[in-house]
């Protein structure tokens, strides 16, 4: 009995904190690894993000969503809210007929206008067939944001209770243009903080 009391005295607080952390991870937070280039340049392949669960979903949040027809979580940006009409015309976003800026796209849109991202897709991380494929997609596109048929002008009406999610690298992202809108229950949390790699640690 004394041995058990001594154990609790020495390790009880540590075990309590460990238990609380484990419970908080189940209910309040998680982490996710970015896979692929769909969120370039905001988030890079292999980065690890801290995700907070049960937050209200707001426009332009970066969220983690679960694909119903797949078995993986994806990281995308919220563009369309329930009931919205989303329209793109030659890289301009209109939300319910109001033109809306997307400053997080400015860098890649400039690169697209400069050389259709050929230099970007020839750099580190785009070696081999992947780079060749990405360059061919970019060459074919007449705008940075196009639909699945490469139309530069297109629109979506977001159903009530659902959200339109797009990647920041519109040319290579598989998102709501391909799989449709996402129900609220399929959005598992909001990415709030990048903690890996150390050189890129911080908010975004």
From Swiss-Prot:
The chain crosses the membrane at residues 11-30. One of its GO terms (biological process) is signal peptide processing. The keyword Protease applies. One of its GO terms (cellular component) is plasma membrane. The active site is at 38, 76. Keywords: Cell membrane, Hydrolase, Membrane, Protease, Transmembrane, Transmembrane helix. InterPro entries: LexA/Signal_pep-like_sf, Pept_S26A_signal_pept_1, Pept_S26A_signal_pept_1_Lys-AS, Pept_S26A_signal_pept_1_Ser-AS, Peptidase_S26. The keyword DNA damage does not apply. Residues 1-10 are cytoplasmic. It is a single-pass type II membrane protein. SUPFAM superfamilies: LexA/Signal peptidase (SSF51306). Residues 31-204 are extracellular. It comes from the Bacteria. NCBIfam families: sigpep_I_bact (TIGR02227). Belongs to the peptidase S26 family. This is Signal peptidase I.
């Amino acid at each position: 009995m004394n041995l058990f009391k001594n154990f609790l005295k020495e390790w009880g607080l540590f075990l309590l904190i460990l238990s609380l952390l484990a419970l908080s991870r189940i209910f309040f937070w998680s982490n996710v690894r970015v896979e692929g280039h769909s969120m370039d340049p905001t988030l890079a392949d292999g980065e690890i993000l801290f995700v907070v669960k049960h937050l209200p979903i707001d426009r332009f949040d970066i969220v983690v969503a679960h694909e119903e027809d797949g078995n993986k979580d994806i990281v995308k940006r919220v563009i369309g809210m329930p009931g919205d009409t989303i329209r793109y015309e030659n890289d301009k976003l209109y939300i319910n007929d109001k033109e809306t800026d997307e400053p997080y796209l400015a860098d890649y849109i400039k690169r697209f206008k400069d050389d259709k991202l050929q230099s970007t897709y020839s750099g580190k991380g785009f070696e081999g067939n992947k780079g060749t494929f990405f360059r061919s997609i970019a060459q074919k596109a007449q705008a940075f944001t196009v639909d699945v048929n490469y139309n530069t002008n297109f629109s979506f009406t977001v159903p009530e209770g659902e959200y339109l999610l797009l990647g920041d690298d519109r040319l290579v992202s598989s998102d709501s243009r391909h799989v449709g809108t996402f129900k609220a229950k399929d959005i598992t949390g909001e990415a709030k903080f990048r903690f890996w790699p150390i050189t890129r640690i911080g908010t975004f």
